Swiss-Prot record:
Keywords associated with the record: Ribonucleoprotein, Ribosomal protein, RNA-binding, rRNA-binding, tRNA-binding
Family: Belongs to the universal ribosomal protein uS13 family.
One Pfam family cited in the UniProt record for this chain: Ribosomal_S13
Protein name in UniProt: Small ribosomal subunit protein uS13
Subunit structure of this chain's protein: Part of the 30S ribosomal subunit. Forms a loose heterodimer with protein S19. Forms two bridges to the 50S subunit in the 70S ribosome.
Region feature Disordered, mapped onto this chain: 94-126
Biological process, per Gene Ontology: translation
GO molecular function, one term: rRNA binding
Composition skew (Basic residues), residue ranges: 108-126
InterPro entries membership: Rbsml_uS13_C (IPR027437), Ribosomal_uS13 (IPR001892), Ribosomal_uS13-like_H2TH (IPR010979), Ribosomal_uS13_bac-type (IPR019980), Ribosomal_uS13_CS (IPR018269)
Length: 126
C-alpha cells in the first residue's frame, strides 16, 4: 500500500483522487502536485513506479502542511481566537456557526439536537 504523509492511499483509485485522502490536500493541490512531479493524473496508484511515489511524497512533504501539523495549526488558530475574545472566538465558545449563517432556523449540526424545554403538556381535567 502506498503511503503519503503517513496515510495509506487506496491502490485502486486514480492518483489524482487518491491524494485527496490526505488531510490538507484537495483536488486542486492534487492536480498541482501531479503536474509538478510529472505524473499522469489518470494512472492508478497500483501502477505507479517506486520512483514516481518518492517524487510525489517528497513534493508533498516539502511544499504543504498536511495531517497532524495542519490539524494542530487549525486548533491553535481557534484557541487563539477564543482567548483574545473576538467575535469568532465567542461563536466557537458557544458552539454556534462562525461564518454569519442564520441560527433562528437551521444550524442544527453546530447546535446539536433540539432540547425540549417543558416537555409535552398533559391533558388537564375539566
Amino acid at each position: 500500500m502506498a503511503r503519503v504523509s503517513g496515510v495509506d492511499i487506496p491502490r485502486e483509485k486514480r492518483v489524482e483522487v487518491a491524494l485527496t485522502y490526505v488531510f490538507g490536500i484537495g483536488r486542486t493541490l492534487s492536480q498541482k502536485t501531479l503536474a509538478e512531479t510529472g505524473v499522469n493524473p489518470n494512472t492508478r496508484v497500483r501502477d505507479l513506479s517506486e520512483e514516481e511515489l518518492v517524487r510525489i511524497r517528497e513534493y508533498v512533504d516539502n511544499n504543504f502542511k498536511t495531517e497532524g501539523d495542519l490539524r494542530r495549526e487549525v486548533q491553535a488558530d481557534i484557541r487563539r481566537k477564543v482567548e483574545i475574545g473576538c467575535y469568532q472566538g465567542l461563536r466557537h465558545r458557544r458552539g454556534l456557526p462562525v461564518h454569519g449563517q442564520r441560527t433562528s432556523t437551521n444550524a442544527r449540526t453546530r447546535k446539536g439536537p433540539r432540547r425540549a424545554i417543558a416537555g409535552k403538556k398533559k391533558p388537564g381535567k375539566k
